């Protein structure tokens, strides 16, 4: 199912998933990367913001503003219920039309990149809106797991729905970022190992755990835009 439809369906229950492995690991990875910087007075863009999973964390840093972009009206409605009056924009393609060039101090995109087919054009658009010296944080379902048949799924009306994903190898994403003049500051990866086994036990999916054990399941990148001279 395409991401727009899938996340419209998922929106009602998205914030009620205490046993969701990816969301738990994303909290760890994103939090680790975000602690590298101060948000005070900064302009922040969240691409694929969903229901605003990270917005309590972001707002606690007192940024000047956050703009959330997402393809799903359902997810944006949930975000507005949680954070009334915050600036959100429905995405129709890769263009961040509500954001001026070289205006963002920080652009984040969590658990979203694999949903993007035109990744090169998307990164170019992100480059347009980020200031020279600004930062980019990306986290996502690890492409190694997707390439091995891993799927992003959820329950909808008792049916299991799988969301369309694209495999963008991490070295390719880093290389494309480098071509834009972005410098990689940190790479974080988490593997499926015994520390996450209990998630699979709760889902009665130990066979899946054994099949994917040792496989990277999530990655995170912290980058800085160093292309002022370009």
Language model segments and positions:
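A short SAM/SAH-binding and catalytic strip from SAM-dependent methyltransferases
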Residues: 106-118
């Amino acid at each position: 199912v395409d991401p727009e439809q899938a996340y419209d369906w998922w929106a009602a229950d998205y914030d009620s998933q205490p046993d969701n492995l990816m969301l738990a690991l994303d909290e760890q990875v994103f939090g680790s990367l975000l602690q590298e910087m101060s948000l005070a007075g900064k302009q922040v863009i969240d691409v694929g913001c969903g229901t605003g999973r990270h917005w309590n964390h972001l707002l606690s840093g007192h940024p000047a503003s956050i703009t959330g972009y997402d393809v799903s009206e359902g997810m944006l409605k949930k975000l507005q219920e949680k954070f009334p009056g915050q600036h959100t924009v429905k995405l129709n393609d890769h263009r961040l039309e509500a954001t001026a060039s070289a205006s963002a101090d920080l652009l984040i995109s969590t658990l979203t990149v694999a949903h993007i087919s035109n990744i090169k054009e998307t990164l170019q658009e992100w480059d347009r809106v980020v200031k020279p010296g600004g930062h980019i944080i990306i986290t996502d379902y690890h492409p190694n797991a997707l390439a091995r048949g891993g799927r992003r799924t959820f329950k909808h009306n008792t049916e299991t729905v799988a969301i369309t994903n694209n495999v963008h190898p991490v070295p390719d994403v880093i290389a494309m970022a480098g071509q834009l003049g972005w410098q990689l500051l940190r790479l974080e990866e988490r593997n499926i190992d015994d520390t996450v086994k209990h998630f699979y036990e709760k889902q009665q999916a130990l066979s899946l755990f054994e099949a994917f054990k040792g496989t990277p399941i999530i990655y995170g990148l912290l980058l800085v835009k160093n292309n002022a001279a370009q």
